[in-house]
């Protein structure tokens, strides 16, 4: 499972002109699921995400988590995180989990974030989404959990 975490002051997901998810200060998470991922992997990644100290304290040091700042999360499914571009000019996505499995584990990840005490807003799985965000920093972290 692979997550790209972006520290944001705000983020919004729109599908067909309708806002489907948004957050104020917190994290925009792009989540990719691999075929070998499990609910346990989703839970471990959610725990790491919730506790990762990438928000500044009073001294300007990255010493606070999204939980510590009372921030929210906008979670977006993103199979393209498993793109393979080693051969040719067109990416292959065979390293991504099949849609049914990815949907299940995307849901498990979001529920695990909620169990950590986070307010989680979601995109629409499999839809064409338009994301509007304001990066804070910018701070962008990639997490891979085997």
Curated annotation (Swiss-Prot):
One of its GO terms (molecular function) is Ser(Gly)-tRNA(Ala) hydrolase activity. Disulfide bonds: none annotated. It comes from the Bacteria. The keyword rRNA-binding does not apply. Coiled coil: none annotated. The keyword Cytoplasm applies. Gene3D superfamilies: D-tyrosyl-tRNA(Tyr) deacylase (3.50.80.10). Keywords: Cytoplasm, Hydrolase, RNA-binding, tRNA-binding. It is found in: Cytoplasm. An aminoacyl-tRNA editing enzyme that deacylates mischarged D-aminoacyl-tRNAs. Also deacylates mischarged glycyl-tRNA(Ala), protecting cells against glycine mischarging by AlaRS. Acts via tRNA-based rather than protein-based catalysis; rejects L-amino acids rather than detecting D-amino acids in the active site. By recycling D-aminoacyl-tRNA to D-amino acids and free tRNA molecules, this enzyme counteracts the toxicity associated with the formation of D-aminoacyl-tRNA entities in vivo and helps enforce protein L-homochirality. A Gly-cisPro motif from one monomer fits into the active site of the other monomer to allow specific chiral rejection of L-amino acids. Homodimer. This is D-aminoacyl-tRNA deacylase. The gene is dtd.
